[in-house]
């Protein structure tokens, strides 16, 4: 009897946790499900929802977007920001929507969550899509800093800024922030030649309802580094194991995404192969906006 009540308590706790999450679905629930996992820590799914979620659903998918616990619209003062916490919330989404399998679409940091979840629960995943996703964090940080050292080789002030970041603890929120702040200041996340379509998508998003809820929890990275030991990882060996386990992996990246080196991209492409890899022209980190038509077309061809 005691074990029965303990089981009941655990089940209740499991589902109660999921209720704190912001979750929104798009499309017909009978279609193939895709769960979108946003970047971060401190991110949210508003840009994806405000520009792309419904259009992806219109391709014949059941799209589920959510904000991770403690991030965006999923406020939770007790959030731990660990991968395990993210896994349990993903499992609660599977339960809530009665999903046996789903495609996991991970963007940026969400790609790490997606990869680690797929490795732990391969039977839950019908396909893993990495979209501008992180996979070798230290190589990304090194690439950002080395690129900028070359760019500013004759600028002592800029070199000093870079050196300060370079000498921080590489397993700290400050180091991560420093690298990405420098990348942002130098246009690493911007497409070089915005198109009429991308300009409209960004402007409509900024004028719309989703932008108003673009909530950023600035404490999220600090708590992630405090609570999560796997805070500077390389998932390529894990991706090989996922592929060997029979889960299809698809990768789509922007040619102008400044946070990845050519060597990184080539190493990733070698894992999945030519037919499961797409490299989009005139496209940076937010590829589902920068080149939305090509992004949607690739996903439809791969997943339908």
Which residue stretches match the model-derived regions?
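Conserved acidic catalytic loop of the alpha/beta-hydrolase fold
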Residues: 87-102
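Flexible "cap/lid" loop of the alpha/beta hydrolase fold
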Residues: 128-171
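Glycine-rich "HGGG/HGxG" loop immediately N-terminal to the catalytic nucleophile
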Residues: 46, 68-83, 139
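Short beta-strand/loop motif that positions the catalytic acidic residue
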Residues: 245, 251-253
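The serine-hydrolase catalytic nucleophile loop
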Residues: 41-52
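Conserved hydrolase catalytic core segment
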Residues: 100-143
């Amino acid at each position: 009897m005691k074990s029965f009540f303990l089981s009941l308590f655990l089940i209740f706790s499991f589902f109660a946790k999921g209720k704190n999450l912001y979750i929104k679905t798009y499309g017909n629930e009978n279609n193939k499900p895709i769960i979108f996992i946003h970047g971060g820590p401190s991110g949210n799914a508003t840009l994806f929802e405000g520009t792309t979620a419904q259009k992806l659903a219109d391709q014949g998918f059941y799209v589920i977007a959510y904000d991770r616990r403690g991030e965006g619209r999923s406020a939770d003062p007790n959030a731990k920001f660990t991968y395990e916490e993210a896994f349990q919330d993903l499992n609660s989404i599977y339960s809530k929507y009665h999903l046996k399998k789903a495609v996991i679409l991970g963007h940026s940091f969400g790609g790490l969550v997606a990869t680690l979840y797929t490795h732990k629960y391969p039977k839950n995943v019908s396909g893993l899509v990495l979209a501008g996703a992180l996979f070798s964090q230290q190589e990304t940080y090194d690439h950002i800093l080395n690129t900028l050292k070359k760019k500013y080789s004759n600028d002592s002030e800029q070199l000093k800024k870079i050196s300060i970041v370079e000498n921080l603890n590489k397993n700290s929120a400050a180091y991560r922030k420093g690298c990405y702040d420098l990348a942002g200041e130098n246009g690493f996340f911007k497409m070089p030649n915005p198109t009429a379509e991308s300009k409209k998508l960004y402007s409509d998003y900024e004028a719309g309802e989703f932008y108003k809820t673009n909530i950023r929890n600035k404490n999220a990275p600090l708590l992630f580094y405090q609570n999560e030991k796997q805070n500077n990882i390389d998932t390529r060996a894990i991706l090989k194991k996922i592929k060997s386990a029979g889960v299809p992996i698809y990768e789509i990246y922007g040619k102008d995404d400044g946070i990845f080196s050519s060597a990184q991209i080539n190493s990733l492409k070698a894992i999945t192969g030519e037919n499961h890899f797409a490299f989009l022209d005139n496209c940076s980190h937010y590829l589902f906006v920068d080149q939305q038509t090509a992004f949607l077309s690739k996903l439809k061809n791969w997943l339908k």
